[in-house]
């Protein structure tokens, strides 16, 4: 089987994105399993190599088919969109935000055209995007906008623990208000379809509880009885294999041990804490509901260490590996 082509947008050039890209691609294993193609700026990549003490060749191409895809060589579609003399490492800049956006935009164009098999993204900075006038708050929103996808789903995976999120970047108070029967049912249907597109044909789901001990039949809250349980019952009527609500202090442990194929977390930090405590560096984000496969590192731009060469590339390597794992079975719309 031919190795999949994985597009890697370099991320915010003022952050650690370029450094983790060159570090990951210095690992020959990435070339044994994939054909990595970086979308970015040649000067930024060479600077990142200098930060990390690496010497790799940069082979610029205009389309994926021109890549060499061999160890020691970084194949790059050079957008030449960063003025290095003006770039300040570890700082929010409109130029950096615009460059990061253009890298994502090009990667999506390649994926939509079927020229790459997946995208593995690197960190971007929301403030830099805002400074550049980009009207989207993060990767998921940008990818949805560029591909025309409505409300893409975020899934975290660490080892065999997969976690979906009923809500993302909203306050905890608002997240509780978003726990409704209608929303939970909609997400169970969509999450099931998302896993099937990744090759998990008959997934078993668990829904996490919201309150302590899943509410103890109304003693500590009634969302489980009044909202979640009816959603689970309705999902079962549609043929979805789902259990719950399972108390949040145990459901993720059982998921890690293989009791479920995926868990629906009811708010952002509930699932984030669970996955990152298993292994912070090896937690990978997967965006479902797009017309292409996208994985991502699960950390930010780390401005505090940008330019030091200290950033770990483990999450980048794991994002590439997971893209390779799902690419053969991924089903487009």
From Swiss-Prot:
Cofactor(s) annotated in UniProt: a divalent metal cation
Top-level EC class: oxidoreductase
Native source species: Heliobacterium modesticaldum (strain ATCC 51547 / Ice1)
InterPro entries for the chain: PdxA_fam
Keyword RNA-binding part of the UniProt annotation: no
Alphabetical UniProt keywords: Carbohydrate metabolism, Metal-binding, NAD, Oxidoreductase
Protein name: D-erythronate 4-phosphate dehydrogenase
Pfam name, any one: PdxA
Membership in a protein family: Belongs to the PdxA family. PdxA2 subfamily.
Residues at which a divalent metal cation binds: 169, 213, 268
SUPFAM superfamilies: Isocitrate/Isopropylmalate dehydrogenase-like
Reactions performed catalytically: 4-phospho-D-erythronate + NAD(+) = dihydroxyacetone phosphate + CO2 + NADH
Cofactor note: Binds 1 divalent metal cation per subunit.
GO MF annotations in UniProt: metal ion binding; NAD binding; oxidoreductase activity
The protein's role, per its UniProt record: Catalyzes the NAD-dependent oxidation and subsequent decarboxylation of D-erythronate 4-phosphate to produce dihydroxyacetone phosphate (DHAP). Can also use D-threonate 4-phosphate as substrate.
Subunit text: Homodimer.
Binding-site list for substrate: 139-140, 276, 294
E.C. number(s) listed in UniProt: 1.1.1.409
NCBIfam families hit by this protein: pdxA (TIGR00557), PRK03743.1 (NF002992)
